[in-house]
Amino acid sequence: LKNMDKVASITLTGSSGLFENSLGDGYPNKENYDYIRKKTEYTFYDPTVASKELVDEIFNTVNDRAKAIRVIALAKSALRHNLRKELNKIDIPANIIWGGNDNITPLFVGEEFQKLIPNAKLSVIDKCGHAAMMEHPERFNALLDQFLTDLNVKNLE
């Protein structure tokens, strides 16, 4: 919002800024691998997307003090900074791609972004949780590509 003159368009997906549904009880069991696995699975409509490699990466992140502090700071910032009154200032094309079954940032948040941002387009991916680009990468990339193609065509006219 501070440098809109340097941005041609934006794409939001599962974005914070209006409503936050935390992962519940934070990371009280951060050293419990099974707990981290369950929280990771909760992110997706299809819990099998939470591969061992992904769970390992998240487990290592939350158990690395410096990384965990950054994650917590980012989450607290999202809770403190509600952007509802600022979104109407976005005067560039906005592409919103949302998981239809997002438990972290529910679909109504994406719908609200669409209402509040002028010139915004919302696309919903069914059977998809919070991380659409991971759960349905082909569909996500096709939607992003179409938005950018349409934007480029408009700019050429």
Residue ranges and their predicted role:
Residues L1-F19:
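Conserved hydrolase catalytic core segment
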Residues M4-D5, D91-I92, P118-N119:
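Active-site acidic short loop of glycosyltransferases
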Residues V7, T105, A132:
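Hydrophobic/aromatic residue at the end of a short beta strand that borders the catalytic acidic motif
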Residues G14, K39, I58, V71, ...:
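Generic structural signal for small/hydrophobic residues in well-ordered secondary structure
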Residues K30-I92:
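Conserved alpha/beta-hydrolase catalytic His-Asp/Glu region
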Residues K39, V71, A75, F113, ...:
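Hydrophobic "lid"/C-terminal helical patch
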Residues I69-R70, K76-K115, V124:
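Conserved serine/cysteine hydrolase catalytic core
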Residues A120-E157:
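Catalytic active-site module of serine/aspartate enzymes centered on a nucleophile-bearing elbow/loop
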